[in-house]
Amino acid sequence: MAISSTINKVSLNIADMDRHYYQTHELTVAQHPSETDFRFMMRIIAFIFNAEENLAFTKGLCVDDEPEIWRKSLSNEIELWIDFGQLDEKRIGKACGRANKVIVYTYNERKAKIWWEQQADKLQRYKNLKVYFIKAESVDQLISRNMSLQCNIQDGELYLSDNDNSFDITVQKFK
């Protein structure tokens, strides 16, 4: 019998001073059985950095031809495609062809730097692509089935906290 996904309720109170975006998002987010708590939190962090009304989680790990987070227009065009990890150029190229803007977030420092050294030249041709490295150690301590997070962004840095923990999260732009 297959293990089912864990369903997490996530309340995000976002104050993004860089974009002048102030909103609360009440989300229901599935965590795939093979997904680590740390990777799940990377998805939440990426959502926070890009938060807006029509941003949504997709089926993610289960579907090859969709990103993990996206924003679609009213005419069903993919305006923003967000993916994670050390992706191959083929997937990135496909995403850049289907979406107006593509963001790839990497999060394992050693692996991310090696991957970027190998991919940087190949990926320069994609003008609608941005690649970032998220430095967010121990954020998996925040995970619970019902999360309520305070999210403050200023000068590109995220201050993420719940009732018991707080973390400074930085994002480094690769491309």
List the predicted regions and their residue ranges.
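Helix-rich interaction surfaces within compact, conserved domain-sized segments
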Residues: 2-32, 103-107, 111-174
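Acidic-basic catalytic patches of nuclease active cores, encompassing PD-(D/E)XK
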Residues: 16-61
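Long amphipathic N-terminal alpha/beta scaffold segment
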Residues: 56-64, 70-74
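Conserved catalytic cores of phosphodiester-cleaving nucleases, focusing on short active-site segments
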Residues: 69-71, 76-92
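A short acidic, amphipathic alpha-helical/loop segment
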Residues: 91-95, 118
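Short glycine-/polar-rich loops that comprise or flank the Walker A/P-loop
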Residues: 99-101
